[in-house]
Every structure is written in structure tokens, then in C-alpha cells.
UniProtKB/Swiss-Prot annotation:
Keywords: Manganese, Metal-binding, Oxidoreductase. The keyword Oxidoreductase applies. It catalyses: 2 superoxide + 2 H(+) = H2O2 + O2. This is Superoxide dismutase [Mn].
Length: 207
């Protein structure tokens, strides 16, 4: 079974400054994300052993650990692609039209997404996702690394609201961090994810 690996970034750690510091990106990627990768591989190894021993209590424990660490790995893998030193501004084309249709305007979407991020209690993410059943865009608060986002949602844009993502630079002023985040959003990546979600998921989850 192939192991999960830490992805390389498309930009240097300092490339998102002054909006997100190089120190934060280095620790976030090389320490925190790496820990999730190790955690998911460890959980898979222990899960395989538990299944071989028919130890159902250990199976359930490691399935829970797998969900958490794999969620962390997936979320961060999207996060790095969602960011770019050439980001910011607004989306265009089909994604822009879909945002206008779902939220009324980009400014209304930005306000709703920012409110979801700033309003999170504890740790988690704000997510813009594509609902493959309703064929629409929705925003969610994702709790921890894996809770509160329903199955069938394809994540397009995420902002990490765990303290390790911002505290060294923004302290407890989450709103300033979220405001800075918009300056480095890689809309080309979000558009690519939207195009794939709308064209490649028909019938994948719902017949």
C-alpha cells in the first residue's frame, strides 16, 4: 500500500508576505502538515494490524484517527494550492457567474465566507464547496479536520482557521488574518476545481 507524502509547494515560504509570513508557512508546512501525513500513515498501519487481529475496538479507534489525519492532509493539500503570490482580485468566467448566482455578488460571498471563518468556535476551516446533488455553491464551517461538511460536497476554496495558521503573525485578531487571506487567493486554482467538480462528478455520488 502506497504511503501518503507531504506535497511540495509551488512557491517559497516567504512568497506570500506580507499577508502570510514565511515563518508561518514554513512551520505550517514542514511541521503541522507533515504531522498529519505521518498520522494518516500510522493510522493505516495500525488499522491493518487491528483488522488482522480482528480487534474491532482498535479498528474503530484507528478509523477515527484516520479520518482526522487524512482530513488534515487533504485540507492542507488544498490550502497550499488555493494560495498564490499572484493571487487576490476576484474570480472571472463561469466561477464568477456561479458565485453571483449563489450569493448575489462576489462582495456578498466574500462577506459570508469571512463571517464563516471568523465565527468558527475552536479549530476548523471555512469552506466554499460545490454541492454535487443540488448543483450549487455553498459555504460551510468545517470543524477540526473532518466534521460538519456533508458527503457530496467538493471543496473549492478553504481558509485554515486553526491558530497555527495565523497566531504568530496576527495573534488573536482573526479578522485581520481573514482580510489578508483574500490578497493571496489563487482564483485560477479555485476555477480549475470548480470546472472539474461540475464536469467530472455527475453520477459519481448520486446516480
Amino acid at each position: 500500500m502506497a504511503e501518503y507524502t507531504l506535497p511540495d509547494l509551488d512557491w517559497d515560504y516567504a512568497a506570500l508576505e506580507p499577508h502570510i509570513s514565511g515563518q508561518i508557512n514554513e512551520i505550517h508546512h514542514s511541521k503541522h502538515h507533515a504531522t498529519y501525513v505521518k498520522g494518516v500513515n500510522d493510522a493505516l498501519s495500525k488499522l491493518e494490524e487491528a483488522r488482522a487481529n480482528e480487534d474491532h475496538a482498535a479498528i474503530f479507534l484507528n478509523e477515527k484517527n484516520l479520518a482526522f489525519h487524512l482530513g488534515g492532509h487533504v485540507n492542507h493539500s488544498i490550502w497550499w494550492k488555493n494560495l498564490s503570490p499572484d493571487g487576490g482580485d476576484k474570480p472571472t468566467g463561469e466561477l464568477a457567474a456561479a458565485i453571483d448566482d449563489a450569493f448575489g455578488s462576489f462582495d456578498r460571498f466574500r462577506a459570508q465566507f469571512s463571517a464563516a471563518a471568523n465565527g468558527l468556535q475552536g479549530s476548523g476551516w471555512a469552506v466554499l464547496g460545490y454541492d454535487t446533488l443540488g448543483n450549487r455553491l455553498l459555504t460551510f464551517q468545517l470543524y477540526d479536520q473532518q466534521a460538519n461538511v456533508p458527503l457530496g460536497i467538493i471543496p473549492l476554496l478553504q481558509v485554515d482557521m486553526w491558530e497555527h495558521a495565523f497566531y504568530l503573525q496576527y495573534k488573536n485578531v482573526k479578522a485581520d488574518y481573514v482580510k489578508a487571506f483574500w490578497n493571496v487567493v489563487n482564483w485560477a486554482d479555485v476555477q480549475k476545481r470548480y470546472a472539474a467538480a461540475t464536469s467530472k462528478t455527475q453520477g459519481l455520488i448520486f446516480g
